Amino acid sequence: TCALPICMEKSPLLSKWASSQRAFLWNDKAVESDSLLGNGRKDLGCEDAFVLYTNPMDDLFRIVEANPSDGKAMEYALSYLLLAKDMDNVVGFVEKYFGAPALKTLPTPVQECLLFYSDYYATMDVKFAVSHGMPQEDVERRQAYDLDWIIAHGVTEENLARFKSFKEKYGKAAQSRNPKSAMASFRETFWYYLLFTQISDN
C-alpha cells in the first residue's frame, strides 16, 4: 500500500497535483501553515459527528465553534439564517461571534437584519403582544437588542440612514395598491426579502 498522493503520482491527469501534495505527507507543520489545509484542520471538531446527520446548520455551527477564523463557514451560517428569515438566531449568532477573527465587521444584509429586528421590537406594544400570546419576558428580552446594542455590534451609521429611508418609503408604499412594486429600489436588501419574498416549502 502507499499514501494516496504517492499512488496518484502515477496518474497522467493527477500526477502534478499529487506531487505538489507530497510535501504535506506526515508533516503537521506544513499542513498547519498552508492557508487551505491549515484552516480545514482547525475546522475539525473535538468530537466525531456525522455530516448532515440533522441539518446543515449543525455542521456549520460545529465548524464555527471550532474555528472562529473560518470566514466561509461564518458567511454560510449567516446566509442560511438570513434566507430562513431566522432573525432571532441571526441576533444570537452576532451576539456570540461578533469580534471573532472572521466577523470583525458585519455584512450589509446582517446589519439590515439587526436594524429591522431592533426597530420591530422597540416599537412593539408589550401589552398588545402579551394579549396575543407572546410572553412578556420574551418581548422584553428582544427589546434589549436596542439601537445602542446593534451599533455596538457592527451596524454603521450609513446603514442606519438607509433604514430610516426605507421606513419612510415603506410607510408611503403601504398605502399604495402595489407596495412591492413601490419598494423596488430596495429589492436588493434583506428588508425587501423579509417583507415581500415567500419561502417555498419545496
Language-model features: locations:
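Short, small-residue-biased leader/transition segments that mark boundaries at the very start
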Residues: 1-4
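Solenoid-like repeat scaffolds
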Residues: 6-13, 60-68, 94-104
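Extended amphipathic alpha-helical segments with heptad-repeat/coiled-coil character used for oligomerization
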Residues: 6-36
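Generic helix N-cap/helix-start motif at coil->alpha-helix transitions
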Residues: 15-16, 31-36, 56, 67-75, ...
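Structural register within alpha-helical repeat arrays
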Residues: 76-77, 112-113, 117
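C-terminal functional modules
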Residues: 118-120, 126-202
